[in-house]
Amino acid sequence: MSDYKSTLNLPETEFPMRGNLANREPVMLKSWTEDGLYQQIRDSRIGRKPFILHDGPPYANGSIHIGHSVNKILKDIIVKSKTLSGFDAPYIPGWDCHGLPIELKVEQKVGKPGHKVTAAQFREKCREYAAKQVDGQREDFIRLGVFADWNKPYLTMDFDTEANIVRSLAKVIDSGHLHKGVKPVHWCTDCGSALAEAEVEYEDKKSPAIDVAFAATDKAALLAKFDVQDCTGSASMVIWTTTPWTLPANRALSVSPELDYVLVEFVKDGATSTVILADALVESCMERYGVESHKALGKAKGQELELLRFNHPFYDFDVPVILGDHVTVDSGTGVVHTAPGHGQDDFVVGQKYGLEVANPVGDNGVYKADTEIFAGQHVFKANDNVVALLEEKGALIKHEKIMHSYPHCWRHKTPIIFRATPQWFISMDQKGLRKQALGEIEQTQWIPDWGQSRIEKMVENRPDWCISRQRTWGVPITLFVHRETEELHPDSISLMERVANRIEREGIQAWWDLDAQELLGDEAEQYRKVTDTLDVWYDSGSSFSSVVASRPEYQGHEIDLYLEGSDQHRGWFMSSLMISTAMNGKAPYKQVLTHGFTVDGNGRKMSKSIGNVIAPQTVTNKLGADILRLWVAATDYSGEMTVSDEILKRSADAYRRIRNTARFLLANINGFDPVNDLVAVEEMVALDRWVVRRAAALQEELIEAYEQYNFHVVTQKLMQFCSVELGSFYLDIIKDRQYTAKGDSVARRSCQSALYLISEAMVRWIAPILSFTADEIWQLLPGEREKYVFTQEWYQGLESVTLDSDLSDEYWEQLLTVRGEVNKVIEQARREKQIGGSLEAEITLYADDALSQALATLGDELRFVLLTSKTQIVALSSAPADAIETEMTSLKLGLHKAESEKCERCWHHREDVGQVEAHPTLCTRCVTNIEGDGEVRQFA
């Protein structure tokens, strides 16, 4: 054989079988950075239509986790695919840099502001800490192969961004959406600050659940409403609550106007009591109270009870009955204890009746000094004391402990309270913001489409947005308020612009250093500076304006896409929508895409305590970033995204299939010159023309899937093409022609041309997902080319040509099926040691008339398709009893071992081996390929 080895066209490539990605990727990254690849891409798209994906800024605290990786990789796939589609798609990464988590980290190091360090020093320490966190996260994102303007990201703490945040607030104020009010807000007593809705998490909590009696002030008036003459003892209205600590702030009892209420007399422990309960809840209440007997004395609609008065159970005043639509009969008594200072529904209904918004609780969760009985007690600790006092007063009907879902601080993981405080709000209704935002939601494309109804419900039900915080590290609310009237300065808008100009030069510290007299002159004594800071959700939510407007890359183009996790419907998508609609009357985005959360193989959330956390850094160091990128792309992100070591191993296996395909392609076009050796598609062997046609059709499907952000469809179709059409069919068939045909014959060049065209297309198909591997392939492709695939567009060289004489795509599909059946028979024969390789087999195909005619079209070339030394076609009706059944009703098979000599060069068993005296071990085909003009192939 050694004599003829040099006559074969053996595959050869520098592209290694093993990716060794963990070691090879960092070398490529270094090259990309040194060559300024991101800028090269930007330069290649000057003047093209822009596509703007605006980055939702991750918080600058801690290492990135797998969810961050998913998010950034999805964005990167989109930006790269849009670039391939010819768009100018800049990507400016951002970071959220203000807020409580950073304050807490800095407090651990330097203490609270005003103690060991001044507030100004504290802010500087926060800035330093955030910058360091950004650097760490940036390195991790770069390692993932994400292309972005990493040298010039946007940080919400950049001076110009801070200034633009102030300018955006000025525009919101100018549009009439800001108001100040005393309202109940989510309040964390550990933070000492209001919380945004997105900063509230719901966890199970054990709480006291109590039924409390409020005795009627005028028993006769009450009985008259129920058309009852008399009853035993006093008549009371009963409330049920899980927050006894809010009872000092009770100012009313709410009933539903349409519900029926019943005056019930019951006996318990020998004593008779008379109470008012919702009719629908009487039986459940009596059961809970453990009464011996009960009877209904009378019935009345809730609206008939309006403004009756009842004594507070332990304070010396009485409260009215009011009507509220928020009252339900889902649980409790059908009567709601109403404390306008401690609940949103309570506040809203209280406003209608002009109730006092009592707030006896301080910032730290302790009752204020003027709170009767409970002064100085922490509210949660006071619960037991309230219960004890109610029992002492004879007002406690039932006391038990229940587990229920309760709001907790996202940072401290501790229960929070609702507490009325003076705050700044963006009003949802005073200028029609809610209605406008709902209209804008309809104009936006939501992916998946359920995102629309989700955010609609949130906007429909959300309260006014409390944008003020009582924190040190944040963008200040740069307003001057009149000391007596609490009115804003009449020149607030122009004053805010002057302050913004200072912040642009000096950062937010400029506000704290500002002497009011510098701006207000003689008026300074009448006004005070607001000391509140903005909710960090305002920082990020205004970035469509504060960032996009200031970056020349965006050319003033509107944002096309926001892409974040599904929790951002109530977070960044919401805050951005509110601010943009308040400022500009329209949504900031055209499309909003959400991805699910990452969970482990058992569907559990990632948790250090469970020990199921998969860190992206570990994956890139062990398997390489391309494996992580392939997992992200292959997973349907519309639901939960499952990841585990086993799943990543499967991704690595899938990656190997793609890599092996690429290696085969490169190894077989080694030395191919696209300028001189390329065979026109119409002159190719039919099988080659078919595979190019398939690749062209696939490219259209892949581009469409990329455009619809269906990356799992991209990977599925790509894997199918590599595994089935190429791996199991085309590449297997062409090996004989590729290796044994004359080196420069049309038969071989046709095949190489097809492989070359597929390689040029495929390297682009995988570039958005397997970026490192695509670059590796690109560097080894033959022909003149730009340095990087990432500056290219989708390949235009795939011509979908079908000649009149061509076999149809359906024909090749049928042949693929026949070949699959033949393979099964050959494999069985190999397992039974009947033959060694497939070329030792001679196959008889017993086919019906239609299939016989189809197979006969290929003539002698059928054996190359079936990878056997000899084939013969016989009528199905002539099949012997021992013919092998297949899954095709039109086909049976026969196999026997070839008896002819084996050609030393091509390994086919042929009767003509040794016919040429000079080459006694070769078939005549091989002699032609060595010494003659080379064999001619028409079909395969």
From Swiss-Prot:
Its EC number is 6.1.1.5. GO terms for molecular function: aminoacyl-tRNA deacylase activity; ATP binding; isoleucine-tRNA ligase activity; tRNA binding; zinc ion binding. Binds 1 zinc ion per subunit. A motif ('HIGH' region) lies at residues 58-68. GO terms for biological process: isoleucyl-tRNA aminoacylation. Keywords: Aminoacyl-tRNA synthetase, ATP-binding, Cytoplasm, Ligase, Metal-binding, Nucleotide-binding, Protein biosynthesis, Zinc. Gene3D superfamilies: 1.10.730.20, HUPs. Disulfide bonds: none annotated. Its cofactor is Zn(2+). A motif ('KMSKS' region) lies at residues 605-609. It is found in: Cytoplasm. Pfam families: Anticodon_1, tRNA-synt_1, zf-FPG_IleRS. One of its GO terms (cellular component) is cytosol. L-isoleucyl-5'-AMP binds at residue 564. Belongs to the class-I aminoacyl-tRNA synthetase family. IleS type 1 subfamily. NCBIfam families: ileS. HAMAP family: Ile_tRNA_synth_type1. This is Isoleucine--tRNA ligase. It comes from Shewanella sediminis (strain HAW-EB3).
